Amino acid sequence: MKKISDNLLEPSQQQLNNLLKYYQTGRYIDAEKLSLSITQEFPNHQFAWKVLAAVLKQKGRINESLIVSQKSVQLDPHDAKAHNNLGIIMKELGRLEEAEASYRQAIKLKPDLAQAHSNLGVIMREHGRLEEACSAFIQAINLKPDFTDAYANFAISIKKIRFTLSNIKLYPILIHVLNTGNYVRPSELAPSILSLLKHDPLIKNLLLKENFATNLKEANSIISSLDKLTLLHHLIRVCPLPDLQFEKFFVNMRSLILTNLDNFESTPEFIHFLSNLSLHCFTNEYIYFEKDEETKLIKNLENEITQSIAKSEQPEAKKILCLASYRQLYQYNWCKKIEALDNLIEVKFRLIEEPYTEKAIVTEIPILGEISDSVSSKVREQYEENPYPRWVQIGLPSKAKLISEICAAENLHLNSKSIQNVIAPDILVAGCGTGQHSIGTASTFSDCKVTAVDLSLASLAYAKRKTTELGITNLEYLQADILKLNQLKQKFDIIESVGVLHHMDKPMAGWRVLTDLLKPNGLMRIGLYSELARLQIAEVRKEITLRKVGTSEADIKKFRQSLIESYKEYHQLLTKSTDFFSLSTFRDLIFHVQEHRFTLPQIKKCLNKLGLKFCGFENKDIISNFRKFYRKEVDIYDLALWHQYEENNPRSFGGMYVFWCQKL
């Protein structure tokens, strides 16, 4: 090649192909070596600088990546993707204004760059500008209809919005989010979707008036109209509805259908409505209150179906579905014999096949020692009766991350950074329930191996079924009491126990066992009930004790109905909780057999006794409110300041204190 100028020299096409191949296949060491070689020989070759910046970012060398990315932009200021990449690095460094400027420049240069629109939406969300964020994500989705990250970001953002106007254009995107992928837990999305649906003309005219259908004609008209509202149907299939107006409607419709079942024609619209209602009631674990008259009619319906099966006659689909909206089909010994559900694949699969799968899984779960502690035995019994919680879909990260990336994202204040050098962490989830927690953890940390334990075999079977369904292979389940976990003879890099220790007889005894299992400088994620946030719940628990309310499903539902009908403020406050709307979550909320509550000064003492250092709370919204409360630069790791804040804002930790700590 004739040398005209250094600027015109180019690396070979083979070098560029290899560079791209190394990066795309995760061979970052090779990619770094080759990109460094190219940039040294051809210092003005912008593509090599761009790849080098991406490689350095992947390796966690973010500051070096910034310098290289700026060089890439300098060499070609018209490269929209280079500006977008620079914005990503700025965002990771917390330089949000500069990140926003980079994304906007990328969009200016290339308006159809979907990634830049999505990234801009993330910045808008960080600034609390949720409507603008959602608009950016929608633009990204319109440009790239299969853009998984944009759907996930849209779902995460919109769950915080409460709508004041109708917006039918959002329906297809929301339906996609509910039906495709595991972007966000549907139960977290439900309040936002319901607030949107309340402004839909169909809902306004049909559902939210004082009197619902009182006769067959009105009921058929409503069912026919609602068949057009596919978003509502998709929602009720996958989660409880945390809204008493919608609950009242479905309770009344269910009762009306049961009372007039023989008079309803099995139209496609009717079967569709009844199918989704049965899925909904199964998912909320039959939390809806039923009157004595309904109980009698259900008993008659059970007998009718049983007699038909005994005569080798097949019951109509509408009768099976009506029963399924009140009772669990898999508990009937005739459930495998019915043919009426053969064409209703999802109903048959979820209401019969999946529970049978779980029964088989129970026999396969390893058991670590006997559960002999009396309180642990009672807690286990509760969760065997009501595995917590029942769920269909889950919110999973689009990509697993290194410990260093997670520490940065959570803004953890570490005593030792050596934990960030662990590439393939061993993780323990102590108290995994039905698998949402353990599956989320196994999907969050790259190259991790997770051991998940729980007291309840029913919960573990549910968790294992969902884990297999999702194709997750780095997760093992074990029945065990936390008090017996020292028998594992294993140490862990990370231990997570959220919503568990406060249900033990002696929480510190369990916490000490977990601390002993944690490697030096290991991380622990803990969730504990707040004394201040649960004052009203504590009052209701006292009422339950004084009134000697039982813990049967009928007793629990009857007491729940009394809360709905009560005018007491602290009763009404409970009805605003999403935990109010399914049986296992409601039972866990106020009927739990064992509950301790903590204050932040108590937690500080516990951490000191255990040799753990507080590294930070998890909830970014609470942290933001904490900063606003003090109106100045403030130490977000000072538990004394947090206690002062909570005393002034007692409902801040209404869920739990969820925080990270590190073993000293």
Where do the PLM segments sit?
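Conserved SAM-binding strand-loop segment of SAM-dependent methyltransferases
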Residues: 471-483
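Conserved SAM-binding loop of SAM-dependent methyltransferases across substrates and taxa
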Residues: 434-447
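Alpha-helical solenoid repeat scaffolds of the TPR/TPR-like class and their adjacent stem/linker regions
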Residues: 1-423, 439-442, 490, 519
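A short acidic, Gly/Pro-enriched loop at the edge of an enzyme's catalytic core
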Residues: 485-495
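A short glycine-rich, Lys/Arg-flanked "PGG" loop and its adjoining helix->strand segment in the class I
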Residues: 508-520
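A short SAM/SAH-binding and catalytic strip from SAM-dependent methyltransferases
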Residues: 493-507, 530
